Amino acid sequence: MKQLSTKVTSNGHGQDSSYFLGWEEYEKNPYDEIKNPNGMIQMGLAENQLCFDLIESWLTKNPDAASLKRNGQSIFRELALFQDYHGMPEFKKAMAEFMEEIRGNRVTFDPKKIVLAAGSTSANETLMFCLAEPGDAFLLPTPYYPGFDRDLKWRTGAEIVPIHCSSSNGFQITESALQQAYQQAQKLDLKVKGVLVTNPSNPLGTALTRRELNLLVDFITSKNIHLISDEIYSGTMFGFEQFISVMDVLKDKKLEDTEVSKRVHVVYSLSKDLGLPGFRVGAIYSNDEMIVSAATKMSSFGLVSSQTQYLLSALLSDKKFTSQYLEENQKRLKSRQRRLVSGLESAGITCLRSNAGLFCWVDMRHLLDTNTFEAELDLWKKIVYNVKLNISPGSSCHCTEPGWFRVCFANMSEDTLDLALKRLKTFVESTDCGRMISRSSHERLKSLRKKTVSNWVFRVSWTDRVPDER
């Protein structure tokens, strides 16, 4: 053991988190409608499988892109050779325009300021290497994605200081919470280098308000620190509201091309909006030339393959397709989210009101034996081992209040979701709290129209996939 590095022998990866342990339990006994109908249903995977049919249809109509051809001629040899790690200009242009389209074309993205990375995991870590020394800190609002403990800290040596948010205001970021987190970092003798937020939020399923974004920009301006806005769920908005990017706020405040804009960085990915986590496509957008230059050099450790760039540049350049896709994706996400919420309500369970994402932030505080995180983990174990549903406990997301859980809804068929909700309802009704819930109060709920989405992807083994899905 003495011959190994501390990264190997330490527990900095966070693999013992209940977030990852739930995945491991699922892999031991995965649900299958025919082969294993009593198996565990995966509701801890933030994967978007609702619109695969649209992409498959596009591939059928565009065989050249899928077959690595140009004007009917194979370009296999061209794509098989070493690529420029700056990325293909055509693909970066298509990515920039797709990001603009998601934001209603209110803001623009310069392709030259985009750095490609093998997913948002790589993009976020690269930014940490660019912005922080080992021991420096970033402030993150809670609850936050459990993988950040690995992505931001494990190899970089950076620290995370939580910005404590509460259910009293829907877990929104407040000025007092920001100041308290900053002061806590100072007490710990940590140099604060910036704030990182996910917008829309994982795990809350809510987009940051304009007020919160204004507050964040004002805060990092006053402290002379950085702001990273992880916007990988920006195309999953399904409410009436438009997605507001931090880039919108910079434009509204007339801070474009200022020193402040050089300290605001956006992370994006095609894993959630297009449902392509296996393609490993992420990006950093920064107005700081030094960041772009350094991150581009670092990207050689996690490139996006030239074959992937060629295929997706063709897909994203088809404006008719992207417009129709984003609209239909929004409709299907909204329908699926409503189905989950309705099913939970029939079991006497409510959620934080959400307008984005592939999951709901579910309130099960009334099912806890005591108001403690120990009771939360006890409830989680019952749901995992007895009900056979893998969901993510709030404690794995550093939530300050026990009893909240992240439940995903876009990685399964409607029939599987209905079965999961049936199992959960049966469990709740078997508890003392469940027996007190009046069933008559739920008779007013209207059933949602079913939508069938075919060709659900068979879950590959835990050992065969990179465990960084959000």
Swiss-Prot record:
One annotated GO molecular function: pyridoxal phosphate binding
Modified residues (N6-(pyridoxal phosphate)lysine): 272
Reaction catalyzed: S-adenosyl-L-methionine = 1-aminocyclopropane-1-carboxylate + S-methyl-5'-thioadenosine + H(+)
Metabolic or biological pathway, per its Swiss-Prot or TrEMBL entry: Alkene biosynthesis; ethylene biosynthesis via S-adenosyl-L-methionine; ethylene from S-adenosyl-L-methionine: step 1/2
Field pH dependence: Optimum pH is 7.8.
Cofactor or coenzyme needed: pyridoxal 5'-phosphate
InterPro entries given in the database record: Aminotransferase_I/II_large, Ethylene_sulfur-biosynth, NHTrfase_class1_PyrdxlP-BS, PyrdxlP-dep_Trfase, PyrdxlP-dep_Trfase_major, PyrdxlP-dep_Trfase_small
Domain of life: Eukaryota
Function text: 1-aminocyclopropane-1-carboxylate synthase (ACS) enzymes catalyze the conversion of S-adenosyl-L-methionine (SAM) into 1-aminocyclopropane-1-carboxylate (ACC), a direct precursor of ethylene.
Record's protein name: 1-aminocyclopropane-1-carboxylate synthase 5
Source organism of the structure: Arabidopsis thaliana
Higher taxonomy: Eukaryota, Viridiplantae, Streptophyta, Embryophyta, Tracheophyta
